Amino acid sequence: MKILIVEDDTLLLQGLILAAQTEGYACDGVSTARAAEHSLESGHYSLMVLDLGLPDEDGLHFLTRIRQKKYTLPVLILTAHDTLNDRITGLDVGADDYLVKPFALEELHARIRALLRRHNNQGESELTVGNLTLNIGRHQAWRDGQELTLTPKEYALLSRLMLKAGSPVHREILYNDIYNWDNEPSTNTLEVHIHNLRDKVGKSRIRTVRGFGYMLVATEES
């Protein structure tokens, strides 16, 4: 499960990323609306934490735009403003929850868990590709009804490949998923985890797209 954090305060951003990773989430952090939009276009996120005071665009305006583009991920707003009108406006344009600075990390974690539970209970938590099934909310995967034993890195790779099933995923995107779990991955880290994942889901299910990356297909080659 991956979270996007949008916060222009560098120290706070680093602290939020570390806190999210400590809770077991993969995490990307950016400091501008432009970078956040690029991240949404190129990746898949289960939730976004959004500060309203961004340097290049008002956070509420940015949120309005991404909702108009049909991004449905839950959004938790962070802000220093605590007026009733601010909260109402944020919720009206598409925020799912609202947290006022300064805040305790325990409350942030609790709100993230609640938003993810609520979103997953809306029926968006399960993916199926051929004989593979993945439950995003529970971090579980099955092959032919048998639960797979996956490391966090293997789960991150499988979820990315299943979300883009039938389409190639660039190595850099997959490498970044691994990097969220590994501070200093070696150059062959991705290949090692792809090899291990193939052993579990079927060697022919994950195809190498030469010069680009990897692609998950629905059926195994006989």
UniProtKB/Swiss-Prot annotation:
Disruption phenotype: Abnormal expression of genes encoding virulence proteins. Decreases fitness in the spleen of mouse.
InterPro entries found in the cross-reference section: CheY-like_superfamily (IPR011006), OmpR/PhoB-type_DNA-bd (IPR001867), Sig_transdc_resp-reg_C-effctor (IPR016032), Sig_transdc_resp-reg_receiver (IPR001789), WalR-like (IPR039420), WH-like_DNA-bd_sf (IPR036388)
Modification type 4-aspartylphosphate: residues: 51
Coiled coil: none
Pfam families with a match to the protein in the record: Response_reg, Trans_reg_C
Keywords: Activator, Antibiotic resistance, Cytoplasm, DNA-binding, Phosphoprotein, Repressor, Transcription, Transcription regulation, Two-component regulatory system, Virulence
Signal peptide residue numbers: none
Organism domain of life: Bacteria
Molecular functions per Gene Ontology: phosphorelay response regulator activity; transcription cis-regulatory region binding
Protein name: Transcriptional regulatory protein BasR
Species the sequence originates in: Salmonella typhimurium (strain LT2 / SGSC1412 / ATCC 700720)
Gene: basR
